[in-house]
């Protein structure tokens, strides 16, 4: 189980034609997690730099909100 201090990245968007739907989903997930006290980092999916970006953010948990 994760605690409230765990850094949760919500991964959304990206190059898909469903990117906007993904952003809407990701934003709703991030809001819900924040409303119950979790540390959330919304992140736009960049397929060329995803690992690097997750490391820079200090992600401990990744919630994947990608569509398409």
Predicted region positions:
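ATP-binding N-terminal substructure of ATP-dependent carboxylate-amine bond-forming enzymes
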Residues: 1-68
